Amino acid sequence: MSSQKIDLTKLNPEQLNAVKQQFDQELQHFTQSLQALTMAKGKFTECIDDIKTVSQAGNEGQKLLVPASASLYIPGKIVDNKKFMVDIGTGYYVEKSAEAAIAFYQKKVDKLNKESVQIQDIIKEKTQYSLSIEAQIRQAAIRQHEAMSKQQQQQQKKESSTA
């Protein structure tokens, strides 16, 4: 992200288009980042919901399907519905109580919410800049068209005065 200020009024249409293209690429990057954060937040929220469901009284001994991969499930049985294996990253798991596991995932959700707000603010700012650049492109095109029209009128006056 560039923090350098550019005077858009001093750029020609080609330069304005290049700046707009750069802003559009940055905007696309931030939009994709926001989507990734939203997906991760959804997964952590789902973990919280699953822990709450499994840890309810009476669920001990219940049968369930345990995901072994994205498309493979293994039959399982809840032995202790008060303890959970929590993925803390890079393939490491830690046993936590239901309350501690929920707190762990809630902390992650809160962090992602904060980051999402920051990215949304950046997206709004980039969108406003992009719209401003579009307006400058239109103005530059109008100025260019007016200059060409004026030049043609002067050319026609010269031709009519020499004829």
From Swiss-Prot:
Family: Belongs to the prefoldin subunit alpha family.
Family matches, as Gene3D superfamilies: 1.10.287.370
Subunit structure: Heterohexamer of two PFD-alpha type and four PFD-beta type subunits.
Recorded GO MF terms: tubulin binding; unfolded protein binding
GO cellular component terms, semicolon-separated: cytoplasm; prefoldin complex
Keyword Ribonucleoprotein: no
Residue span of region Disordered: 144-163
Function of the protein: Binds specifically to cytosolic chaperonin (c-CPN) and transfers target proteins to it. Binds to nascent polypeptide chain and promotes folding in an environment in which there are many competing pathways for nonnative proteins.
Gene behind this protein: GIM5
Note: Present with 2900 molecules/cell in log phase SD medium.
Protein's recorded name: Prefoldin subunit 5
Coiled coil: none
UniProt keyword annotations, A-Z: Chaperone
Lineage start: Eukaryota, Fungi, Dikarya, Ascomycota, Saccharomycotina
Keyword Chaperone applies: yes
Database matches in Pfam families: Prefoldin
One GO-annotated biological process of the protein: RNA polymerase II core complex assembly
